[in-house]
Amino acid sequence: MPEFLLYNAPQSTCSQRVRFVLNAKGLAFEEVKLDLFAGDQLRPDYLKINPNGVVPALVHDGEPVIDSAVIMEYLDEIRPEPESLRPKTPLGLARMRSLMRFIDEVPTPAVRVPSYNLAFLPHFQAMSEDEFVALANSKPLRREFLLSMGRSGFPEPDMKSALDRLARAVKRMDEIIAASGGPWLMGESLSLADIAIMPVIVRMEDIDLGAAWDDKPNVARWLSAIRAHPAFRPTYYFGSLLTEKYPHLAERKSKQAG
């Protein structure tokens, strides 16, 4: 068995966080790609690794570590080289963790709403109601989310609320970068907070919500900087973006641009 074994899904935003840290650290890892719509994450062998039935899960020397935020910090703890992704002072570390908590509670769940409505809904609409309910009930951490969406998608008020939360997060991000002096959230050094928000911003751009930072130059510069990081390209290999997997999304984005 390799030292690092990553169970994940290419388009999963939480998986993308962990892939980025592994790549930034230069750590060799074996990737096991799970088909979430086929229910790979609910197989008994995977549930032994991650009882929550979600991705990602990292197995390090045979021991599982779950939850993307926990995995990221674990990797930085055991491999601080070539450069630590956490502030060196207790106060800086506390501020980074507070920011990561905000990211996990506000924009990360919010971006799932337009993602599901725009990309994943046709898959659920092809199911019977009983099949859909059974699927929702099988996902301990996503049950309420899926049931609130239903097979008809999230209603307009839910979409509006999600977009408002994303706009609020982008505004706060712009302000934090300005206050820190940039180019990153915590100032001069890339941190786990940047990597935590990265998949949200990349997803927003992918599903044509990038106008949220048209008047936020700090966020635009931040996105250019993280795209230029050596870990970005191997993290976002082909098939990691929704527009690369779902042709109807790519067509929609092209029409919007035209």
Question: Where is each model-derived feature located?
Answer:
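GST-like domain detector, emphasizing the conserved glutathione-binding G-site
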Residues: 1-141, 179-181, 253
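Short, solvent-exposed turn/loop segments enriched in Gly/Ser/Thr/Pro and often Arg
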Residues: 9, 35, 192, 239-240
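Short polybasic/polar patches that bind polyanions
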Residues: 23, 205, 228
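Short, hydrophobic secondary-structure boundary micro-motifs
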Residues: 83-88, 110-111, 185-187, 213, ...
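GST-like fold's C-terminal all-alpha helical module
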Residues: 108-224
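Long, positively charged, glycine-interspersed low-complexity recognition regions
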Residues: 213-258
